[in-house]
Every structure is written in C-alpha cells, then in structure tokens.
C-alpha cells in the first residue's frame, strides 16, 4: 500500500502472495532485490538459486563468505556490463550518490550540525564555498552538477584529461 499498489494489484498481475520472506526464499528460483541481502537472507539462499541485486561485496567479507557458502548464483547489478563496456545498472545509483554527496556536505557544513558555518552558495559579501571533487566519473560528474548548481566554486580532479576537457566544455 505504501507505494500505491494493493495486494490485489499484484495478485491480478499473477504474483503469488506469501506471508514471510522465508516462504519466498524456499520457493523462488530467482530472488530480485535492490539492496544487498541481509545476513538472515543469506542463510535462506540455496544451491542453484539465483540472486540478482546490488551486492557491494568489497567492504563486506561476511556477506561474501555467506553467499559463497550458499552455492547460489549471485549476480551483482553493479557488475552488469553493456556491449560498449558501460555499467548501466550502476550509473543511476552513482548519479544519486554524487548528488547526495553535495547535499550531505552542505548539511554537515552548517553550524547547527557541528560544521564550519559555511554555505556552499555563499551570500552577498561572503564567497561561495570551495568544493574539491576527486574523480570525474559518474559520481563525480553528478556531484559537480549539484555543486555548480548551488553556486559553489568547484575543482574536479581526475587522471583522464579528455574527461576533464569534456566537463569543462559543459
């Protein structure tokens, strides 16, 4: 209901409704999620079952070990690559992360939040904050757009000079 669909809508579309997650994991051949599996979900995975989700394995050794032990077939959205070598499922999340990074920075720069009492945009008589962004990929480019949009003075650093030229031309 919270997202605007009633159980009946799902049932009319052919979905089978169950009462608890363990029923889904016990019966489904494929689990499709957005967030990485929680520890209790990893325990419910079974050999040959397909899990398709963002996994973020690098910082989470316990999750990695649990997934390996499950013998499930785990496909990470962030590793799906298109024919041209791009990461089409990672890009939207990266865009959100880049934009949110500037919002979070603005929040933490406020004096009320323990910051240095800086406004990213500045005000008449007070210069805008200086923002340094490391990396001009999808996250960095989204952060750049947000910071420039707020009126900040931005420096973006990347080893790819062609990418920096491309951004400078915008």
Language-model region placement:
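Conserved beta-strand edge residues that scaffold enzyme active sites
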Residues: 1, 24, 81-82, 161
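An N-terminal-biased, well-structured beta-alpha scaffold segment characteristic
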Residues: 1-66
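Glycine-rich phosphate/diphosphate-binding loop of Rossmann-like nucleotide-binding domains
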Residues: 1-5, 114-170
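Short Asp/Glu-rich motifs
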Residues: 4-6, 29, 85-87, 166-167
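Generic secondary-structure signature for well-ordered alpha-helical cores
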Residues: 15-16, 30-36, 69-73, 79, ...
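A broad detector of short, well-ordered amphipathic alpha-helices
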Residues: 26, 96-99, 103, 141, ...
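Residue-level detector of alpha-helix initiation sites
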Residues: 36, 96, 137-139
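Glycine/serine-rich phosphate-binding loop and adjoining beta1-alpha1 elements at the start
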Residues: 39-130
């Amino acid at each position: 209901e919270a997202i605007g669909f009633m159980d009946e809508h799902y049932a009319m579309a052919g979905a089978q409704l169950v009462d608890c997650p363990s029923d889904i994991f016990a019966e489904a051949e494929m689990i499709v999620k957005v967030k990485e599996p929680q520890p209790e979900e990893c325990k419910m995975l079974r050999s040959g079952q397909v899990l398709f989700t963002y996994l973020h394995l690098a910082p989470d050794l316990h999750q990695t070990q649990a997934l390996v032990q499950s013998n499930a077939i785990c496909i990470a959205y962030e590793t799906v690559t298109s024919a041209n070598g791009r990461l089409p499922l990672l890009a939207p999340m990266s865009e959100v992360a880049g934009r949110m990074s500037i919002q979070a920075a603005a929040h933490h720069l406020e004096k009320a939040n323990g910051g240095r009492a800086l406004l990213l945009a500045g005000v008449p008589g007070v210069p805008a904050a200086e923002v340094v962004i490391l990396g001009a990929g999808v996250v960095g480019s989204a952060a750049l757009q947000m910071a420039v949009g707020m009126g900040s003075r931005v420096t973006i650093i990347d080893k790819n000079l062609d990418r920096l030229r491309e951004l400078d031309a915008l």
